Amino acid sequence: MSRKLDRSRELQKRAEALIPGGVNSPVRAFRAVGGEPPILVRGEGARVFDADGNGYIDYVLSWGPLILGHAFTPVINAIEKAAEKGTSFGASTPTEADLAEAVVHAMPAIEKIRFVSSGTEATMSAIRLARGFTGRKYIVKFEGCYHGHSDSLLVKAGSGVATLGIPGSAGVPDELAQLTLALPYNNVAAVEQAFTKFKGQIACVIVEPIVGNMGCVPPAADYLQALSDITKREGAVLIVDEVMTGFRVAYGGAQELYGLKPDLVTLGKIIGGGLPVAAYGGRKDIMDKIAPLGPVYQAGTLSGNPLAMAAGLAMLCHLRDNAMEIYPRLDQLSADLVNRVLDAAREAGVALTANRVGSMFTWFFTDKHVTDWDSAATCDTKQFGQFHGAMLDAGVWLPPAQFEAAFLSSAHTEQDIDDTVAAAREAFAIL
């Protein structure tokens, strides 16, 4: 179909005069796919609507938080009820402990938890805590894994920086970047070599248990357990970054899925019900090093703010009470969608592979199975951009970058899947 974008175009032009690039996060500018970004004004269930009235089946879902769909009534009601009592106090509220209890019950690795306002804050704080606990300075991360935009973690970070075609970010001092050891994902030997070379100097290993920021890339068999074994042996802290996967791939996150018990966990997205919130938590002996109990400082004016706590609690309570229905259905719908689009690509002669874990997935425009950053980098990003534009024209909203994961929600229906597959067939025909 032909979409009118007159109003979106006007709004984008106005924003560009006031905001760098007209956006508050680079991927929203559509630089990776071309075309004009629609300006969204409303979401309902599995759909979003732009300023010109165009509707789209949404597989971005605010980059993962909206597992129950847009404007989910119990979450909206919880936010409204909390807002009537006050939007922020800069002091503790009962709902903080309620949400903390819900998370601790869901994830056995978390004995204590601290709420913050973004995933970047969570991973940055977890890194600082690991360094403070161990007295060591080096950290290990993996190529193509994105853990937010703190300086230490913007090294071979996949996702946004990969989309921009740069290895990291200007403004990160070399002296700081040199303390971050970026290793290939799914490669245990590389981790062993790093710990041999930097014996007794590595504070932590931080890993996305299922990568979402070079597209969806699951761990190889026993990879996560190997990381756990190595860090335990070497006295380092294992940080599992579940900002994206927590409560998404299972109610207990990737930890439940893979039987993992890390030292620290970072969370975000779903635990805020669509509002800005994140957290880090883990072993009591480590968490008790945080001020005011210990010497590792972290604070925030809006940390644990009542609106986000209420939204997150409503979200987690619904997921907990309906987990036996929600997660199997999401898995089945996602498998159906991913496989049928793969079939359509094969019939059209388009090279396409896919990875999926639960309701988190990516179609890769390559004939290679993607297991790490090197294989992800073989994707035809230009062809993905053409596909993305054709899908938008057909009313399907996909992540505007090849190296981002897509998601389903409980609001998606079988008809949504049928319509998306039909749109993909038409898109493949014109590539």
From Swiss-Prot:
The keyword Cell wall biogenesis/degradation does not apply. Its EC number is 5.4.3.8. Its main location: cytoplasm. It catalyses: (S)-4-amino-5-oxopentanoate = 5-aminolevulinate. GO terms for cellular component: cytoplasm. It holds the Pfam family Aminotran_3. The modification N6-(pyridoxal phosphate)lysine is found at K269. Homodimer. This is Glutamate-1-semialdehyde 2,1-aminomutase. InterPro entries: 4pyrrol_synth_GluAld_NH2Trfase, Aminotrans_3, Aminotrans_3_PPA_site, PyrdxlP-dep_Trfase, PyrdxlP-dep_Trfase_major, PyrdxlP-dep_Trfase_small. It is found in: Cytoplasm. Pathway: Porphyrin-containing compound metabolism; protoporphyrin-IX biosynthesis; 5-aminolevulinate from L-glutamyl-tRNA(Glu): step 2/2. CDD domains: OAT_like. GO terms for molecular function: glutamate-1-semialdehyde 2,1-aminomutase activity; pyridoxal phosphate binding; transaminase activity. It comes from Koribacter versatilis (strain Ellin345). It is an enzyme of class 5 (isomerase). GO terms for biological process: protoporphyrinogen IX biosynthetic process. Belongs to the class-III pyridoxal-phosphate-dependent aminotransferase family. HemL subfamily. Its cofactor is pyridoxal 5'-phosphate. Keywords: Cytoplasm, Isomerase, Porphyrin biosynthesis, Pyridoxal phosphate.
